Amino acid sequence: ERNILTMDMGGTSTDISLLRDGQAMTSNAAEVGDFPVVMPVTGIEAIGAGGGSIAMIDDGVLRIGPQSAGSYPGPACFSRGGTAPTLTDAYLLAGYLPEALLGGKMKLDRTASERAMAPIASGLKSDVFGAADMCVAVASSNMVAGVLPYLARQGVDPEDLTLLVYGGGGGIHGPLLAAELGINRVLVPTSPSTFCAFGGLVSELSHDVMETV
């Protein structure tokens, strides 16, 4: 695959980037803290939708994020004290997640997800399962709203791309995003949750030297 849209979905955000002809696209507009980086960096666009993103009703409108439950307490279904309805809770109630992960070692609390989602369902005049479906749909819309302008700036048609998904939620939401964008091929690497760390270990080092003249 030579033309790839990457999608790294974590707990707080979804980061997208683009490879054309096997080469990562770069950007000259990056900052570390408040300081501009005066050299090309990998062009990454962050979208405020992740597995821990909290659902809320704002003036009658369903919104996902940017607030996040984080890794602790995390989604309500993790049974770590979280009570806010998150996108992960929506995945569980909508049937995208099983009720146990890690070979059954990590149980997900469906009842806690239903309890957390109840205020959202009430605000939407729906049951918790319908509310969960709407949460997933809004998250997809947020992603599409971020991805399409990014690809337009690069002059790329989504239908010409393969979607590479990783991160904790990439394998769940990647196919949904691909369907919205008209992308026909989705790749999920082995161990997607640790794919970034793996890349950091095996990538070749490169050096850029710049001098002001």
Name these PLM-found stretches:
Residues E1-V213:
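N-terminally biased helix-coil "hinge/interface" segments that flank
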